[in-house]
């Protein structure tokens, strides 16, 4: 059997309820298409069930503003941090079967961070189209008249030190959603993932 799950409001309780069933599968499809993110600690928790070795996390930075420095025309200053590596889960059995991760242009924020970790761990193939290219952590600006905008506050690198902000995580296998398949209640991206897993 090939297990799959998609939950745009992922949380640990939801995953824990599924995990015993996931362990019984022969392969797993994780679908984070159209997932705008949420709490990055959930992504860290999820990946910890699929790895045997620690995964380094990418360095992130955010601009700092010190009014006096600005008045003296100092160059922009940045706060930088490299979080601790993600460790394998030590309280449960690690899932060792093949995994495919599905992504698209509306995979953002913590969902995209999960994609970064998954790719860094070399845990499986990423199938779909490039992700959105934004880590999230937005600041909201009220523009008035019922309008607003969000601006990303973090600049982040992947686990290998590569840029993905404004670029997206590139899939290993490109698969675009097909309108004809969709109209017939199918999913061409999942079909591509299944074809790949059957070939293993």
Locate predicted features.
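C-terminal regions of proteins
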Residues: 133-179
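Low-complexity, Gly/Ser/Thr/Pro-rich intrinsically disordered linker/tail segments
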Residues: 170-200
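Cleft-lining beta-strand/loop regions that shape enzyme active-site pockets
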Residues: 1-144, 196-198
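Short, intrinsically disordered/low-complexity patches at protein termini
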Residues: 53-54, 63-65, 150-151, 173-175, ...
